[in-house]
């Protein structure tokens, strides 16, 4: 069973789960957080279990404003705040007696797959990273998945919300996804997103809320990993993409991978799958989890084996 933990990030209490292998350590640790509107119970325990089997501890946390963590407005995604939460989670991990602070890895999926790249590029404490089906350029992502007409509607909603926030201070909300995405303004206009997250909420992540602030989408359109990739000079980097992923756009992901200069990098394509299958199909999830576990074992465990 994981251990409940908490630490402070920018004045708010962030809560998480610590998973650890048998024994006293010190162990390498993988710092983990989720994608869009994730909570720590959603999918991530399966990945954490794989990393523990590989000999690593794992720290999974809820971002500020989500799940069990403090912070307002609720369900508001600021990627730079989330990246700061990652770095504060690393600082917390360094204080743990069971952790070897010289063997810290980061892992992310979907939106946080991009965060893992940026954290790895900007925090020298990160010695290894895994980026799974990442968001790499938010504006391009939103324009492509919504199409020209849909993106006009989304842009109008963002501008109207900004004016309302200026006048009243109140944040507006839209669904993360919806079966009625053709007529309703949503963030991710895919029916399989609605179905998969409803099932995950019912079976393993009751804290998940399937909505986000409209300002979160504006933040997404100003988010890109590309300026940071050139700074990943020597950090072992694994990127896992889903063949044909049209949600976070596998062609853009591969373009980002090709711009990472380190020679210690690997691209793994999960064949015959989709973005959401890596959430909902345990056999496909296991493929991605085991690839990440092998990567962390290769770079954080085996070189230090006595």
Regions found by a protein language model. Name each.
Residues 246-252:
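Conserved alpha/beta-hydrolase "acid-adjacent" motif
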Residues 40-43, 66-105, 282-287:
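Catalytic nucleophile-loop/oxyanion-hole region of alpha/beta-hydrolase
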Residues 271-273, 277-306:
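Catalytic active-site module of serine/aspartate enzymes centered on a nucleophile-bearing elbow/loop
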Residues 50-70:
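Conserved alpha/beta-hydrolase
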Residues 117-197:
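Alpha/beta-hydrolase-fold enzymes
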Residues 1-25, 279:
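N-terminal cap/lid segment of alpha/beta-hydrolase-fold proteins
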Residues 26-35:
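Short beta-strand element of the alpha/beta-hydrolase
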Residues 232, 239-241:
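Short beta-strand/loop motif that positions the catalytic acidic residue
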